[in-house]
C-alpha cells in the first residue's frame, strides 16, 4: 500500500494549479494511490479551486500534513520530455502520458462564437511597464496586428470578466467588440466555441491548452 498523495501548488493562480491537474488521475490509474489537496492551499479565487480540483473525481478531499506532490524544491531539477505536463508526471514517478492539462468540466459549445477570436491580454503575474518580467508593449501591439492581418476574416472580441479574478494588468488593443465572461466555466464554454485566443503566457493560455482536448482547432 503506497502512501496517499498530498498535492498542492505553491502559488494560487489558475496556471499554477492546472499544471498539476493530470496527476491525481494518473496516481490512481498507475499506482492505485488516492490524492488529497494539502490543507491550507490558497487559491486566487474560489473558481480556480472549483474548476481544477472541485470537479476532479480523483481528488478525495483535503488532508493535513506536508505535501508530497506539486512544485516541491526537490523537483526543480526536472527531467525533460519537451512537454511541461509530461515533465511533471515524470518527476512524480509516473509514466508521462498527458501533453495537456485536464479539466473535468464538459464545456458547452456556443455556435455564435464560431469564426471569432477571443482576446485576453490580461495577466495577474505579468506586468507591462517594460520592466523585466513582462512584455514589450510595442511588440505586443505589433504581434496583435500581425495576427489580425493573418486572420482578417475572423472577428476579434475582447474578453471582459464579470467577477473579480485578482489584480489584473490589462493591455488594451482595438478589437471588434466585447465578450463578457460570467464565470470560469463560461470561459471554458467560450474557449470551446471560438476559433482562437490571443493571450499572454498566463492562466488563460494554460486553460486554453486544457480546452484543446475538446476543441482541437483552438
Regions found by a protein language model. Name each.
Residues 1-218:
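Catalytic machinery of carbohydrate-active enzymes
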Amino acid at each position: 500500500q503506497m502512501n496517499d498523495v498530498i498535492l498542492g501548488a505553491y502559488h494560487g493562480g489558475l496556471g499554477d494549479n492546472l499544471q498539476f491537474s493530470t496527476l491525481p488521475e494518473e496516481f490512481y490509474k498507475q499506482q492505485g494511490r488516492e490524492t488529497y489537496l494539502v490543507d491550507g492551499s490558497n487559491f486566487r479565487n474560489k473558481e480556480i479551486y472549483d474548476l481544477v480540483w472541485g470537479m476532479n473525481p480523483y481528488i478525495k478531499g483535503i488532508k493535513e500534513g506536508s505535501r508530497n506532490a506539486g512544485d516541491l524544491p526537490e523537483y526543480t531539477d526536472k527531467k525533460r520530455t519537451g512537454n511541461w505536463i509530461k515533465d511533471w508526471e515524470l518527476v512524480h514517478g509516473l509514466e508521462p502520458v498527458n501533453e495537456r492539462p485536464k479539466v473535468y468540466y464538459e464545456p458547452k459549445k456556443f455556435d455564435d462564437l464560431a469564426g471569432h477570436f477571443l482576446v485576453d491580454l490580461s495577466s495577474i503575474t505579468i506586468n507591462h511597464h517594460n520592466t523585466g518580467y513582462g512584455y514589450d508593449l510595442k511588440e505586443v501591439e505589433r504581434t496583435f496586428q500581425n495576427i489580425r492581418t493573418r486572420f482578417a476574416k475572423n472577428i476579434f472580441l475582447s474578453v471582459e470578466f464579470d467577477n473579480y479574478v485578482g489584480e489584473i494588468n490589462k493591455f488594451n488593443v482595438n478589437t471588434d467588440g466585447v465578450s463578457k465572461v460570467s464565470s470560469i466555466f463560461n470561459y471554458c464554454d467560450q474557449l470551446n466555441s471560438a476559433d482562437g485566443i490571443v493571450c499572454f503566457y498566463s492562466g488563460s493560455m494554460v486553460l486554453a491548452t486544457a480546452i484543446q482536448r475538446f476543441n482541437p482547432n483552438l
